[in-house]
Amino acid sequence: MLIDIHDLHVQFEQGKQAKHVVKGINLHVQQGETFSLIGRSGCGKSTILRVIAGLLTHWQGNMSLLGQTIKPQQRFQGALRRNIQMVFQDPYASLHPQHRIERAFSEPLKIHQIPFDKDTIKQALAQVGLPADVTSRYPHQLSGGQRQRVAIARALLLQPQLLLLDEPTSALDMSVQAEILNLLNTLKKEHNMTYLLVSHDADVIAHMSDRAALMENGELTQHYDREALSKGIHRLD
């Protein structure tokens, strides 16, 4: 089991009160599958991704990731940090506007003490359909689809086992969305990765997922297998 979560709770302080945003969920994801969380904005989907990515450490419950027991307030380090990567909804926000794309690639390599190798970066870009000269450009010189491809390529540099996808195509035009989704499916097979996808788009969920769960008000209220997703039973009213 790549992700094994029991009774996960997350609360945020709001003045003198606490807002309970994730309420005792159980989540189990097998190696090699794409599991998706579908739900409206604000239901807690992205909060779960942030917990699993190690970006949010104030939670309660029991969690195992990649066979390793995780404790609240634990900092992800070493192989665990390298093997769990995240692609955000807006790649522009994760790329420094005054840094060339080459620097965006060099930073994760430096963090994990991996030698900087232009051939490796060139290969990562080629896998997502981008030319090598992209590294000399700034984020604002790229289209939204190109920036998302850069974000995916940067995550692939570290050869993660688990890729967390937070609304990865919602900021893109429909035609570009399809290209990115097909690219993600291809890369998953080539690299034997596991995906945890968050989306409010039923078509994206159906296209990508082996299984999915509906999240409402901080709880997982329904689960869908591949057959149910194919029939569109997961569609929100």
Where are these regions (language model features)?
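Helix-to-loop junction immediately C-terminal to a conserved catalytic motif
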Residues: 53
